[in-house]
Amino acid sequence: MIFFRVGLEQNITLPPPPMDDKGEAEEVKIIVANRSAKDVESIRNHDQEPFYAIRKFCEEKGLVFHDGEFDQIIDESVPIISHFKKHFNRDRPVDVDKTINTLPSKTNKTKSYPSGHAAQSRLIAKYVAGKFPEHERELIKAGDEGGYGRVKAGFHYPSDYEAGNLLGEKMYIFMNKADYKKENE
């Protein structure tokens, strides 16, 4: 099954990032200074699995998906997200202000805008909510945990997070939502 057609990024638009990176980096410093031990644990859990909180929610509620289904969505989203990161070419907050206390990460090696984790976690949240609409509010909240955690980690500006959510919403609109099992038989 293919979730996204090739070239989809040409049909999606995003607003440019704000111009004041230094001002927004100051916001990030305040957010980072107020992160809790619980935030740090969540950030670590989401580093290589942007949908970690969503997966945990699905497990708790018995919402079953096929092995590899979420991973395939994430994998197919990468070229679209990368297109926008290359286009906007925004430096990460720590590149603007070296005093930001970032956490360790294996996944913060690309440009900042939009946040890929925010886009991917919103996309997965919407995908699951499309199948289980009664859980949409909780799924969006779980997705936001993964996305906003990247701001709390010092990896992204708040505007990166907002644009990532917007990109995730737009990608969901265009995504193939056919039954995964039937498509893979």
What does each model-found stretch correspond to?
Residues M1-A153, K170, F174:
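Hydrophobic alpha-helical bundle signature of multipass membrane enzymes
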Residues H117-S121, H156-E185:
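Alpha-helical transmembrane segments that form the membrane-embedded catalytic/substrate-binding core
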